[in-house]
């Protein structure tokens, strides 16, 4: 239901059951390697999904049709060898994901140590209350373009939406749609290295708007085409490139601490972030000395560069797999 065709491999020493919307595929180990079958089925998720039956929104997998699916089955030793190679790639991908999570946590820890913890007992000497907008050169609106080439809409791009930002933060841009926009519009809104894309519309009752992602020469390579962003996002262009990670981490810090819920307006279905109040009206304690921001950038940039390189390696391994 909702996820027809998705496959996972259960390899845990725990007692567990599944509900009626999940099918267990139990392999005859004399004929096939279970891990090999798992990879085969995962590769064919779309095919499995096409066997689903029922009304729109309440479709279920046809177990009978699943049984009828044909599979090219090499000799058992060859199956095991193939599964071992694929499993090794998966383990490497998982390791890189966990490494990135650790690196991101390290960057956030440094941010807290430099800019949050010093203010717990009041405003330190050499600090002042200023808005995040003091660090921003300009804010640009996005464009959704067209689904197909039409008239002047000829430039093929990947368009980042708010929902894609979560993928970009955690892993890779897997579902970023392809759109077509005008050349003039592309030139005016194409993100540059050091820019930040901020989600301003979306959210739910339990998840606020306000997710963000920085743009770099590394994560730009993760996309098939040049990138733009939708009109449900805003591009923040820092006055200096060394403000990028400071702004990104500050926005993320506010987001994970649920500060953006109080800045939302709109209907119950679609929430809009009052980003102008966030960036220009609210004041936060910040150091006056710009050398502090430059030093912070030098400390965390190596972490983010490693994160981006890991993402590129993950993408390469996934294509290989």
Go through each PLM region and give its residues.
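Basic, amphipathic alpha-helical recognition segments used for DNA target recognition
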Residues: 12-15, 23-77, 131-139, 153, ...
């Amino acid at each position: 239901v909702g996820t027809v065709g998705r496959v996972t491999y259960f390899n845990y020493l725990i007692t567990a059951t599944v509900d009626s919307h999940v099918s267990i595929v139990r392999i005859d180990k004399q004929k096939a390697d279970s891990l090999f079958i798992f990879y085969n089925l995962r590769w064919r998720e779309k095919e499995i999904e096409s066997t689903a039956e029922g009304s729109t929104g309440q479709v279920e997998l046809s177990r009978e049709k699943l049984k009828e699916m044909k599979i090219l089955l090499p000799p058992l030793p060859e199956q095991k060898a193939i599964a071992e190679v694929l499993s090794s790639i998966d383990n490497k991908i998982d390791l890189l994901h966990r490494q990135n999570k650790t690196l991101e946590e390290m960057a956030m820890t440094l941010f807290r140590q430099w800019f949050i913890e010093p203010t717990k007992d009041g405003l330190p000497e050499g600090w002042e209350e200023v808005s995040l907008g003091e660090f921003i050169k300009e804010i640009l609106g996005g464009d959704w373009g067209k689904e197909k080439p039409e008239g002047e809409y000829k430039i093929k791009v990947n368009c980042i939406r708010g929902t894609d930002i979560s993928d970009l933060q955690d892993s890779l841009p897997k579902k970023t749609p392809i759109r077509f926009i005008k050349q003039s519009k592309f030139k005016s809104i194409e993100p540059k290295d050091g820019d930040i894309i901020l989600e301003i519309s979306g959210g739910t009752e339990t998840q606020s708007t306000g997710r963000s992602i920085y743009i770099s020469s590394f994560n730009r390579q993760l996309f098939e085409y040049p990138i733009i962003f939708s009109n449900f996002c805003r591009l923040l262009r820092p006055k200096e490139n060394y403000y990028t990670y400071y702004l990104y981490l500050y926005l993320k810090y506010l987001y994970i601490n649920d500060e953006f819920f109080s800045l939302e307006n709109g209907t119950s279905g679609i929430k809009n972030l009052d980003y102008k109040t966030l960036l220009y009206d609210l004041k936060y304690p910040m150091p006056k000395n710009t050398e502090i921001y430059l030093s912070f950038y030098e400390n965390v940039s190596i972490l983010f560069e490693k994160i981006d390189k890991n993402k590129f390696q993950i993408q390469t391994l996934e294509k290989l797999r």
